[in-house]
Structures are given as structure tokens and as C-alpha cells.
Amino acid sequence: VHLTDAEKAAVTGLWGKVKVDEYGGEALGRLLVVYPWTQRFFEHFGDLSNADAIMHNPKVLAHGKKVLSSFGDGLNHLDNLKGTFAQLSELHCDKLHVDPENFRLLGNVLVVVLARHFHEEFTPDVQAAFQKVVTGVANALAHKYH
């Protein structure tokens, strides 16, 4: 992902304020609600019967935190996202058989969650920078599929 110095500063500056444990569960929960076909990968998480059940499901919240923590780790390696996410790409491709489109969807949902929490700070320029990053992460996670 090619980011200008200003974009890197915007992304890392805002990320320092992200409540990973809270926003991760919200992002994954929203993915499962908005795109219900993604639930098939999480059937072992228990009750996913409606939005309220999903958004309060402890396994969804815990996995969302894990996903967002991994995303945050990627921000430390913006120049090598493919290498950073190589093992996760292999896992999701070879073992879990996740449709790589889901990575793009989750990235877009994450942008929505950030906009929801950061209002005025989440300017169009900040959104554009984050959109580059989530696209780069999605591409890195889909790399094994190519």
C-alpha cells in the first residue's frame, strides 16, 4: 500500500485512539448482520439468530478483537502487508475456505465503524487513507488465492 506521509500519520494517529476490543466486535458483528451469508464461517459461535444476538455474542466479540488486533499489527508493516498476512491468508484459503470477497466487505464495515466512532475526526481524507489500508489488507489476505 502506498500512503503519503500525511496519510500514514492520519491512519496511525487515529488508530492510536481505537478501542480494539470494542470496535473489533462491532465490526465483525456488523459484517455478520449486514452480510448474513458470512455467518456460515461462524456457525460454531452459537446464537447468530438476529442482530442483537450477534452483537452481544461473546465469541463474535472475542474474534472481532482478534481480527482487529491483527489489523493493527499490519499497520506496523504497511510496506509489507503480503508478508505480514501470509500465514493468515494461507489459513483462510487452505483450511477455512473463506471467500476472499469477505475481506473486502469486512474492511468496508471497519471504515463504517471508525466513521461512527470518530465523527469529525474521520474526515474524507482520513477515510480515503483508511480505505487504501483496508483494501491493501484485503488484497494481502486474498494473496494465497491467486
Curated annotation (Swiss-Prot):
Single Gene Ontology BP annotation: hydrogen peroxide catabolic process
SUPFAM superfamilies on file: Globin-like (SSF46458)
One Gene Ontology molecular-function label: haptoglobin binding
Any single GO CC term annotated in Swiss-Prot or TrEMBL for this entry: hemoglobin complex
Residue numbers binding heme b: 63, 92
Signal peptide boundaries: none
Pfam families, alphabetized: Globin
Sequence positions bearing Phosphothreonine: 12
Domain Globin, chain residue ranges per copy: 2-146
Tissue-level expression: Red blood cells.
Modified residues (S-nitrosocysteine): 93
UniProt key word Amino-acid biosynthesis: no
Keywords: Acetylation, Heme, Iron, Metal-binding, Oxygen transport, Phosphoprotein, S-nitrosylation, Transport
Organism domain of life: Eukaryota
Modification N6-acetyllysine occurs at: 59, 82, 144
Family note: Belongs to the globin family.
PANTHER family per the UniProt record, alphabetical: HEMOGLOBIN FAMILY MEMBER, HEMOGLOBIN SUBUNIT BETA
Function: Involved in oxygen transport from the lung to the various peripheral tissues.
Subunit structure, as described in the record: Heterotetramer of two alpha chains and two beta chains.
Protein name per its UniProtKB record: Hemoglobin subunit beta
Annotated organism of origin: Procavia capensis habessinica (Abyssinian hyrax)
Organism classification: Eukaryota, Metazoa, Chordata, Craniata, Vertebrata
